[in-house]
């Protein structure tokens, strides 16, 4: 189901109920841009902290324009999952000094057009949102009784014009009509809040309240002392305004409250965007970033990482093309997994997706991630308990517990990021040290071209005459070492901190000097004692 500002508040109770009743929730998002510059290129040298530091300053200029959530409920009697999917269309907003901005890239626009992204829905019907830090700012102005002035700062000309026109209508009604009440239709929640307070200030004798059954109408009484009616309390008006401005943050808070497992595919960037857009600006500290995410989403599963780890249990003939989301979903949906020939759960959508549905639509991709999670969990549970048992969500979650809070890291020094514990030590093959024997300055591009024939590598200088090479597989290391064993142009060996780094060599020389000096001192002392 598409969720925009037109139907969000009508559906919010249903969304809340589906979140509460679910056994897990899958997530996906579509972005306005991606990091493509050379400085953001994935590298096998990267630690997770270095990767985070590369991205944190640039993420603020990019936004999630679509968020997909699918709530999976389990029916034990039918041994089936019921999936309810939502696609939330989000659009930045201006309120006071909060001027949410974003950039688009031509390549991203082309990609989104290819996958039928609805830009009109994004711009005209997009749901507003704030982060928790934005909410704290609004509440501070509210406590200081400055919320009215703060919100007024960002009024556009058309909004000011509407407020003035409505005020004139009320003035005319008061002077020329005998009716006791008057209604104003105000769709804009910000204008509605401001108009309540503006009218009370201009015409102290009137009473304003929200119309029963229609929150977009302002009901005005000529006499504020009329029996049975009273002004809508300012606190209620402020609550309503902030509730509107928070927008999609209500859903984030529901996810935080109910602590349901969150499932996604390749979630590293998703977590960066989620933090920046709904928690607050990304912190300088990588550790604090992980802590903040874990406090909101304490249980995360990444099907990209899980499938990577479990693929080692498949034979070559039964493995998937790749563990990209589309390939993984089709592998399971087309029942190509021989590990899942018996007893798999039915997964049924409450509202089917459009027959022309394509990948890279957030709602559909979220569903696909959840579907793959169910199949991976079933496979893992079967290995633990056998194929004859009914396997519900608890058994699946227990079987996948070793992968909990481990988010895939693409082409980095380690294969995953751990949001609840320390990250793992580097688990890539040993680095190679390449020394140029003929030239005084190593040609890094030439070395990259030569060694690139062995497979995908990353390379960086290590002094004037040497470079470090990172590979993705041990067989590449072995093959390179064997091929260049007696090469006259380059000496290639396994990298050693003590042997090849300046600090390491300095430590060795310092140790040698200290050891030598101590030995001379002892010899001198011994010789002196003999003479005496």
From Swiss-Prot:
InterPro entries: CAF1_poly(A)_ribonucleases, RNase_CAF1, RNaseH-like_sf, RNaseH_sf. GO terms for molecular function: 3'-5'-RNA exonuclease activity; metal ion binding; RNA binding. Its EC number is 3.1.13.-. It is an enzyme of class 3 (hydrolase). The gene is PNLDC1. Belongs to the CAF1 family. Mg(2+) binds at residues 28, 30, 270, 365. SUPFAM superfamilies: Ribonuclease H-like (SSF53098). 3'-5' exonuclease that specifically cleaves precursor piRNAs (pre-piRNAs) at their 3' ends. Trims pre-piRNAs to their mature size, a process required for piRNAs maturation and stabilization, and subsequent pre-piRNAs 2'-O-methylation. The piRNA metabolic process mediates the repression of transposable elements during meiosis by forming complexes composed of piRNAs and Piwi proteins and govern the methylation and subsequent repression of transposons. The chain crosses the membrane at residues 503-523. It is a single-pass membrane protein. Its cofactor is Mg(2+). This is Pre-piRNA 3'-exonuclease trimmer. The keyword Mitochondrion applies. GO terms for biological process: nuclear-transcribed mRNA poly(A) tail shortening; piRNA processing; priRNA 3'-end processing; siRNA 3'-end processing. Keywords: Exonuclease, Hydrolase, Magnesium, Membrane, Metal-binding, Mitochondrion, Mitochondrion outer membrane, Nuclease, RNA-binding, RNA-mediated gene silencing, Transmembrane, Transmembrane helix. Interacts with Papi/Tdrkh; interaction takes place on the mitochondrial surface and recruits PNLDC1/trimmer to PIWI-bound pre-piRNAs.
